Swiss-Prot record:
Name of the protein described by the UniProt record: 7-methyl-GTP pyrophosphatase
UniProt similarity note: Belongs to the Maf family. YceF subfamily.
GO cellular component, one term: cytoplasm
Function: Nucleoside triphosphate pyrophosphatase that hydrolyzes 7-methyl-GTP (m(7)GTP). May have a dual role in cell division arrest and in preventing the incorporation of modified nucleotides into cellular nucleic acids.
Family annotation (SUPFAM superfamilies): ITPase-like
Active site residues according to the UniProt entry: D79
Reaction equation(s) it catalyzes: N(7)-methyl-GTP + H2O = N(7)-methyl-GMP + diphosphate + H(+)
Family annotation (PANTHER family): BIFUNCTIONAL DTTP/UTP PYROPHOSPHATASE/METHYLTRANSFERASE PROTEIN-RELATED, BIFUNCTIONAL DTTP_UTP PYROPHOSPHATASE_METHYLTRANSFERASE PROTEIN-RELATED
EC number(s) stated in the UniProt entry for this protein: 3.6.1.-
BP GO terms, sorted: nucleotide metabolic process
Location(s) in or outside the cell: Cytoplasm
């Protein structure tokens, strides 16, 4: 009897972020990682939400274009933009800039836009969503902020604090519809998108998806 099992498309995470990869691994589903080659500079006059959504979609489509998959692929693109005092804030890159960020945000609120795109090459359809998270920082002595930075070196994250680690001690409150959005990959939104794309999240064994 011929094999009539409809196999799901290959799933790809379009990201170089180890944080997003770790989040996706929580789902226990097979996926590959391909880093997108993309200019992530915001466009003039672009809102934070528009920047995040544009880049999430561009990452997914750029990676999909490099994959030779006759049966199609599902590509996950994600981008996060943080705003403070009406301005986008990027990854600090250095200890000095990270400390300046944290000092300026003490007792204040920072808004994070975590955009997600699931691109289906079989239909050329892209599902997109922007999850907004509001984070209020505690007021702490500069010496403690400096000690935190030296302990966790969060120089590759916007806002200079890793909420999934010791950085949670810098925060007073987090308001979001998706607790994983702040780390960079909104899993509630993603699983909703995967279900809409008929991806078998609840296959009983990994072999069912092979």
């Amino acid at each position: 009897m011929p094999d009539t099992v409809c196999r799901p498309p290959r799933l790809i995470l379009a990201s170089s972020s180890r944080y997003r990869r770790a989040l996706l691994e929580r789902l226990g589903i097979p996926f590959d990682v391909v880093s997108p080659d993309l200019d992530e500079t915001p466009l003039a006059g672009e809102t934070p939400a528009a920047t995040a959504l544009r880049l999430a979609g561009a990452k997914a489509r750029a990676v999909a274009a490099t994959i030779d998959a006759p049966d199609g692929v599902l590509v996950i693109g994600s981008d996060q933009v943080a705003t403070f005092d009406g301005h986008q804030i990027g990854k600090p890159g250095t200890h000095e800039r990270a400390l300046a960020q944290l000092v300026s945000m003490q007792g204040r609120e920072v808004e994070f836009h975590s955009a997600l795109c699931l691109y289906d090459s079989r239909t050329d359809n892209a599902q997109v969503e922007d999850i907004v998270t509001h984070v209020r920082f505690r007021s702490l002595p500069e010496a403690e902020l400096d000690a935190y930075l030296r302990a966790e070196t969060p120089y590759d994250v916007a806002g200079s604090a890793k909420s999934e680690g010791l950085g949670i001690a810098l925060l007073d409150a987090i308001d979001s519809d998706d607790p994983t959005a702040l780390v960079g990959l909104p899993l509630i939104a993603l699983t909703r998108m995967l279900r809409a794309a008929d991806y078998p999240l609840f296959a009983t064994t990994r072999g069912d998806r092979a």
